[in-house]
């Protein structure tokens, strides 16, 4: 966590108890948006002791799945427009999905349109394979990502 808070007063919503699955939740031919959301909703924010779900950084509506093209799109909304943690949040989302999904899915992670001052730059970095690999090989960044994904504080 950072010493000086970037967003000292985030809006926090109550954590949902559980998600209701559709009837086809056990299908063998792919994943659905609710399943993907369930994977990422409990990731802890890098700055606050709240989940991405509680801060409304991610929502059920922010996940799109195209099984025909084996593509998943997650859009996330930083709590402030100048959020310096946007890249870390995106790395957390990507690392968690890499752990949970089969390799054949193409995952795009983007900040919601108009939600970040450096939207184009952040989106480019989060979807550049070489940059993502290099970032996750950095021990300090990897430790922060792992703390957010595997946090016991939640």
From Swiss-Prot:
InterPro entries: FSCA_dom_sf, MIP18, MIP18-like. Signal peptide: none annotated. GO terms for biological process: protein maturation. It holds the Pfam family FeS_assembly_P. It comes from the Eukaryota. Disulfide bonds: none annotated. May play a role in chromosome segregation through establishment of sister chromatid cohesion. Unable to complement ae7 mutants, and thus probably not involved in the cytosolic iron-sulfur assembly (CIA) pathway. Belongs to the MIP18 family. This is Protein AE7-like 1. It comes from Arabidopsis thaliana (Mouse-ear cress). The gene is AEL1.
């Amino acid at each position: 966590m950072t010493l000086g808070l970037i967003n000292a007063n985030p809006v926090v919503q109550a954590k949902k108890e559980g998600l209701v699955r559709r009837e086809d939740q056990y299908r063998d031919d792919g994943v659905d948006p609710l399943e993907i959301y369930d994977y990422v909703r409990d990731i802890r924010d890098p700055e606050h002791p709240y989940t991405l779900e509680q801060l409304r950084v991610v929502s059920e509506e922010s996940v799109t799945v195209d099984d025909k093209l084996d593509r998943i799109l997650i859009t996330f909304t930083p709590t402030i427009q100048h959020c310096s943690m946007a890249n870390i949040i995106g790395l957390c989302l990507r690392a968690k999905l890499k752990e949970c999904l089969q390799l054949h899915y193409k995952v795009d992670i983007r900040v919601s349109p108009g939600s970040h001052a450096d939207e184009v730059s952040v989106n480019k970095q989060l979807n550049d394979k070489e940059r993502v690999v290099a970032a996750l090989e950095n021990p300090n960044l990897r430790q922060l990502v792992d703390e957010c994904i595997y946090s016991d504080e939640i």
